[in-house]
Design a protein with these regions (language model features):
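Short glycine/proline-enriched coil/turn segments at helix->beta-strand junctions
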Residues: 29-32, 105-106, 129-133
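Residue-identity detector for threonine
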Residues: 4, 16, 27, 56, ...
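Short, surface-exposed amphipathic charged segments that create phosphate/polyanion-binding patches used
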Residues: 169
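Nucleic-acid-binding surface
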Residues: 13-14, 48-123
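Nuclease-adjacent, charged terminal/linker segments that flank catalytic cores
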Residues: 1-65
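Generic structural signal for beta-strand residues in well-ordered domains
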Residues: 3, 102-103, 127
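Hydrophobic, Leu/Ile/Phe/Ala-enriched alpha-helical segments that form helix-helix packing faces
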Residues: 39-43, 77-85, 129
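Catalytic cores of nucleic-acid endonucleases
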Residues: 109-165
Length: 169
């Protein structure tokens, strides 16, 4: 059985980011009432699978759970920015960044997450690749002290734990 154009768009999004949740698809691809049926059809077609609410592309075999969680957290922040009409679209990036988000003013914002215990190496990578417009996502407020390692300026620092509580950026 064939897949529809909208299902193909959903599948393309899941292939691109490897992991997402239904809310991410609703925000970036398809906010129609049929989105859940489209996702279910892709599962039935064995194009994607869902485990604990996380939608994964069928081609992903050896899941790195830390990397999966990073992708989901960055997409959570991007989805909130899109809901607030602060960004228009997103596209994938190479490390150390996860996505580039196009703002309403046609500027690009480069988003990455800094993991606990890896601050020194990840911040050094961000410093080396920082072109401006960088949004750093910290897992929690204990990581703030590491920001002094940066030699370049970042546009915004978001603490994910706080974001989860109040959905404010």
């Amino acid at each position: 059985m064939e897949i529809t154009k909208k299902e193909a768009e959903i599948l393309d999004f899941v292939k691109t980011y490897k992991y997402c949740i239904e809310e991410h698809i609703r925000t970036f691809v398809d906010n129609s009432l049929s989105v859940q049926k489209r996702i279910e059809h892709l599962v039935w077609q064995k194009q994607i699978y869902i485990s604990e609410g996380i939608i994964t592309f069928k081609g992903e075999k050896d899941i790195d759970f830390a990397e999966r969680d990073n992708v989901l957290k960055v997409l959570d922040i991007a989805a909130q920015l899109k809901k607030e009409d602060r960004i228009i679209e997103i596209e994938p990036m190479d490390e150390p960044f996860y996505i580039a988000a196009k703002s309403q003013k046609n500027n690009y914002l480069y988003m990455t997450i800094i993991n606990k215990g890896k601050e020194m190496i990840q911040l050094k990578l961000v410093d080396n690749e920082n072109k401006g417009g960088t949004i750093l996502i910290l897992e929690d407020s204990t990581q703030i002290e590491y920001l002094k390692l940066l030699t370049t300026k970042v546009s915004k620092v978001i603490i994910y734990d706080n974001f989860i509580k109040d959905k404010k950026i």
